[in-house]
Amino acid sequence: PGLQVTMVEPKPHYYSCFGANWHFAGIRDLSKTKQTFDALRDKHGVEIVQDRVTGWDAEAGRAELAGGGQLSFDRLVVSPGIEFEWDKVDGMGPGDTDRVPHAWHGGEQYRILRRQLESMEDGGVVVLTAPPNPFRCPPGPYERISLIAHYLKQNKPKSKVLALDAKDGFAKQGLFEQGWRELYGDMIEWVSASDGGRLYEVDPKARTVWTQEGFQKHQADVLNVIPPQRAGRIAQEMGLTDRSGWCPVDQRTFASSQQPNVHVIGDSAIAGAMPKSGHAANNQGKMVAAAIVNQLRGQPVPDAKLVNTCYSLVSPTYGISVAAVYRFDGGKITGVEGSGGLSPSEADEFTRIKEARYARGWYDAITD
């Protein structure tokens, strides 16, 4: 009861990654994905400090704020998120995203991409480049491909979506491709890395990309480049990352392997078999909170089971999902054999409709 919890966050609100793709299909206005931190303060008594942590002394238990203040801590939990590895995108940088949006965080980026889709002539080509693993929200690019295709089918049916991928496979691939065939025919073309999909160079001004080591040119009318990713900048600056660019942790407590009294959760953490998803991060936060409380009380860390659930919309009325249960075993988080699973490939139309409804319900519940 005497525990004081303070959250330092520079923004008064944020736009959730999950649900943002729905904006492209007109399912939900982007404003509905705007979330605040009011419930943490009003329901749970968390002190909210609108500032930015610029660094800390883990041994001394002191964090420095951009506004000049300091905060003392017994435990520091950081969620650095992601940053883009622009040095791996030849020809493009952060200054080009008004013309070639990534639309992978931040509300305005989603609006830019939506406006470009609306302005495109019927018969145009939307090119999306999907990043290499690991990255935030593994099914995200493929839900986006689906919902852009839905918009085009309704409004610009002569158009197509060309997806160029840095990988040879992706999350829920069989279910997505089944939905694409059923709903969109040949409107969507997905090109794997082995077949020449790996991004080589971008010309933002011309909205042109090259693949196959620069030998294959693709001209876009709308170009959406999702860059390679690594742990957020503060994690890089404060030495929380390893050579992979991500943050190694004790996967039982998410305590940093690099510094004492610091825990890392969310997309930036190396979390074993768990994906970089919103549901996973939510579970990690709860588990880490329980672990810290027990440690401060001198009690054993709980033997927690972790869960991930991810819904994706192939159309407003066609939902698919994956679920998994995880445990700590042999020093890392592993999947529990026989748990979870995918939506059945043979599901009928009513089941797909129900899963689309469940997706909306899941979003409303996790953001409540």
Where are these regions (language model features)?
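Beta1-alpha1 glycine-rich phosphate/pyrophosphate-binding loop at the start
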Residues: 1-47, 132-174
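C-terminal auxiliary extensions adjacent to catalytic cores
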Residues: 321-368
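Hydrophobic/aromatic beta-strand patches that form the interior of the parallel beta-sheet core
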Residues: 6-8, 49, 77, 127, ...
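Active-site substrate-recognition segment that forms the wall
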Residues: 132-156, 247, 256-265, 269-273, ...
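FAD-binding core/adjacent interface of flavoenzyme oxidoreductases
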Residues: 47-143, 147-154, 224
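Active-site-proximal substrate-binding core of FAD-dependent oxidoreductases
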Residues: 274, 291-338
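A Rossmann-like FAD-binding core segment of flavoenzymes
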Residues: 43-55, 59-64, 71, 150-245, ...
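FAD-site-proximal beta/loop scaffold in flavoenzymes
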Residues: 93-120, 218-286, 294
